[in-house]
Amino acid sequence: MAEKQTAKRNRREEILQSLALMLESSDGSQRITTAKLAASVGVSEAALYRHFPSKTRMFDSLIEFIEDSLITRINLILKDEKNTSTRLRLIVLLILGFGERNPGLTRILTGHALMFEQDRLQGRINQLFERIEAQLRQVLREKRMREGEGYTTDENLLASQLLAFCEGMLSRFVRSEFKYRPTDDFDARWPLIAAQLQ
């Protein structure tokens, strides 16, 4: 029984990895059908539906992976690092690095892969970005408590500016068919971003 569950879990992971790879390839710029996905995995469409009731559930699983990866790592940064500027830099670098290492998932983060899917999926990505923005806002607000001095600019504006930078770099990565990596020249870009944090 345990072997059967492991095999099923492995097949589910194989399906999700194939979907992510298809999103990374030129297929990712078009609608991915279950027929194409089944052919990529080497199974029938019926076999796909034994593991996932719908393509929407496949995307849900990928979004769940994105959420878990980013939020868990952001929480680790907040736990381990106390300096506000360093926290912000590491969170931004985390988001950009995650996108760079997972090009197919970046198409989901930018909404590009979700254009032909249910609106609910885009809503989940919107909620993820709202959670990240709320965490950035909290880090910015805690500066006064941690370092004795806050920002002169409203923390809401600063948090949205940081997130807009991340979203812009991820969109540029997708638009360029993954040519312009989000972390390229990050050490040169960060002082420009940090200069806005006043």
From Swiss-Prot:
One of its GO terms (molecular function) is transcription cis-regulatory region binding. It is found in: Cytoplasm, Nucleoid. Keywords: Cell cycle, Cell division, Coiled coil, Cytoplasm, DNA-binding. It comes from Salmonella typhimurium (strain LT2 / SGSC1412 / ATCC 700720). One of its GO terms (cellular component) is bacterial nucleoid. Belongs to the nucleoid occlusion factor SlmA family. Residues 10-70 form the HTH tetR-type domain. Pfam families: SlmA-like_C (PF22276), TetR_N (PF00440). Required for nucleoid occlusion (NO) phenomenon, which prevents Z-ring formation and cell division over the nucleoid. Acts as a DNA-associated cell division inhibitor that binds simultaneously chromosomal DNA and FtsZ, and disrupts the assembly of FtsZ polymers. SlmA-DNA-binding sequences (SBS) are dispersed on non-Ter regions of the chromosome, preventing FtsZ polymerization at these regions. This is Nucleoid occlusion factor SlmA. Residues 33-52 bind DNA. The gene is slmA. Its main location: cytoplasm. One of its GO terms (biological process) is negative regulation of division septum assembly. Homodimer. Interacts with FtsZ. Residues 117-144 form a coiled coil.
